[in-house]
Amino acid sequence: GFIGSNLVRLLVSRGHQILNIDKLTYAGNLQSLTSIEENPRYQFVNADICDADKMTELVADFQPDKIMHLAAESHVDRSVDAPGEFIQTNIVGTFNLLNAARSYFESSSNKNFMFHHISTDEVFGSLGDDGFFTEETSYDPRSPYSASKASSDHLVRAWGETYGLPIVVTNCSNNYGPNQHKEKLIPTIIRKAVAGEPIPIYGDGKNVRDWLYVKDHCVGIKKAIDTGRLGETYNIGGRNER
């Protein structure tokens, strides 16, 4: 995926050994990782997080120090037309991965293990005319996508509280940058402008988003998993409202 491929390249460049699990839906593209595909520290497995047995097998075999969970259906408009896919991947898939992580953690002597759930500020709903979302902002999802991500956030925290799974959650604003799928807003605007086609306007055209460069986001993800406190939530934004 978009954020995941940028994160994998960063982690491999810093000497980490990576197992990359991806279902390779329409939004996945292995060409994003051609620069590291032959790296001995990198391994790719084509698998679906909705396959509970496969997740348990892969986690047990790889014996990770950290699990960084970025697998998700993420297009808001598609979630309106086909919400079932979002429920399955974002909620059931997260449940499966949490159970695989719990099984591994409880049978392992690895005291450095952590499950890092990467989420979105969409779970907070609309911000209003000013201010910022904070880690204390109440959840107010407005679409099947954001509702499914909110559900997955709560599942992760519940596994931390109920089973003692070492977890951390990060919620990010809108990412942009290399390898982003063409359906997203900035690639769509660029593509339409280059082709001389009308640029789509959403709502009354007054909506404002915070934009976060994907490589900056990846640095923030790395910071959270390296120094974040167990059980905490961290918002990652760009302070770049447009």
Give the positions of each predicted feature.
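N-terminal Rossmann-like NAD(P)+-binding domain of SDR-like oxidoreductases, especially those catalyzing
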Residues: G1-N175, A195, K215
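Short acidic, gly/pro-rich beta-turn/loop elements at beta-sheet edges
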Residues: K54, Q180, W211
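Active-site/binding-pocket entry motifs
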Residues: E122-F124, N207, E241-R242
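Glycine/proline-rich active-site loop of Rossmann-fold NAD(P)-dependent oxidoreductases
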Residues: A150, N175-T188, A195-E197, Y202, ...
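Short aromatic/basic micro-patch
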Residues: V169, W211, E241-R242
